């Protein structure tokens, strides 16, 4: 982080607030895409009126002080007033517990956001991840447009963002599986926020590799979504375990089933999914890679989110 980089950040954020997304949710600045030299450690999100600034590496003391000054100036700017922003939260992702501090506005522990007209509840200031990964915005929209009348399996469901999009898109039924039951509980809350019929949604709080019987029982599925963490201690190691899922897909899918397979590790490119699918489930053919939101531009397109569509 340099003085020149901070000036770039200031100008970018003032412009972003001038053209704020209103009640919607968007990333305002994506330094981690490495398109902004000196700002690789910072991102800024607009969460339906809350500005979330995330630091992924500790800057030098003088630059950290300058960043605080910049953010204070931002909250007193005409652009801030114009945007109607309600608060600013700085999260130190590099520190133990992802320590957070409110620099403006009334502290909020929970906050409702909107994405493509759908509502989600976030945790602010208490957890490393707030509850919705914004880079998957277009993936959720694709699911919403794909699933009318279909049965969906959502693996590694987290807070059920895909499920909310699927039910909004007219899916017949969605089965969500995640070993984190608290995340699934939040998923229920997200469906309720959108006044969805919960009789069409199933929540399985189980470890996937011990639960194939339960997963098969609720199938077959027209769409299987696989969006695992890069590493989940004690339960999932991406490169070793992803293949185990892929080889099971043919027994889970309907005759013309579709798979949305995702990976979000900078060290793993799309060829990993394409080659692994060809080896483990050759019946499934690669169709396309979904676009990522333009605000998540990355200097290396193989480093950012990969969301690939396969069909029988």
Language-model regions, residue ranges each:
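Conserved SAM-binding motif I beta-strand of class I
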Residues: 173-178
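Conserved class I S-adenosyl-L-methionine
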Residues: 149-158
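S-adenosyl-L-methionine
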Residues: 179-225
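C-terminal catalytic and target-recognition region of SAM-dependent MTase-like enzymes
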Residues: 258-312
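Non-catalytic accessory regions of SAM-dependent methyltransferases
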Residues: 1-48
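S-adenosylmethionine
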Residues: 208-282
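Conserved SAM-binding loop of SAM-dependent methyltransferases across substrates and taxa
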Residues: 159-171
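Non-catalytic substrate-recognition/targeting regions of SAM-dependent transferases
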Residues: 37-38, 43-45, 66-133, 141
């Amino acid at each position: 982080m340099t003085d020149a980089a901070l000036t770039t950040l200031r100008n970018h954020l003032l412009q972003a607030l001038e053209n704020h997304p209103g009640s919607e949710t968007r990333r305002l600045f994506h330094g981690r895409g490495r398109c902004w030299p000196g700002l690789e450690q910072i991102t800024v999100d607009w969460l339906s009126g809350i500005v979330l600034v995330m630091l992924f590496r500790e800057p030098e003391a003088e630059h950290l002080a300058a960043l605080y000054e910049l953010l204070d100036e931002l909250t007193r700017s005409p652009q801030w007033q114009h945007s109607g922003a309600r608060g600013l939260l700085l999260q130190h992702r590099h520190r133990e517990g992802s320590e957070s501090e409110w620099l403006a506005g009334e502290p909020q522990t929970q906050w409702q956001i909107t994405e493509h007209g759908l509502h989600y509840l976030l945790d602010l200031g208490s957890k490393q991840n707030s509850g919705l990964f914004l880079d998957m915005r277009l993936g959720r929209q694709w699911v919403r447009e794909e699933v009318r009348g279909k049965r969906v399996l959502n693996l590694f469901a987290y807070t059920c963002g895909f499920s909310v999009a699927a039910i909004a898109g007219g899916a017949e039924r969605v089965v969500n599986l995640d070993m984190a039951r608290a995340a699934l509980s939040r998923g229920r809350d997200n469906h309720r926020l959108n006044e969805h019929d919960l009789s069409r949604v199933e929540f399985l709080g189980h470890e996937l590799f011990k639960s194939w019987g339960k997963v098969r029982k609720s199938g077959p599925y027209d769409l299987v979504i696989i969006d695992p963490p890069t590493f989940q201690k004690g339960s999932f190691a991406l490169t070793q375990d992803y293949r185990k899922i892929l080889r099971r897909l043919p027994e889970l899918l309907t005759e013309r089933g579709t798979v949305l397979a995702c990976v979000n590790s900078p060290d793993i490119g799309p060829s990993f999914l394409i080659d692994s699918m060809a080896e483990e489930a050759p019946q499934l053919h690669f169709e396309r890679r979904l676009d990522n939101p333009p605000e998540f531009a990355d200097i290396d397109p193989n480093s950012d989110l990969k969301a690939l569509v396969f069909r029988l």
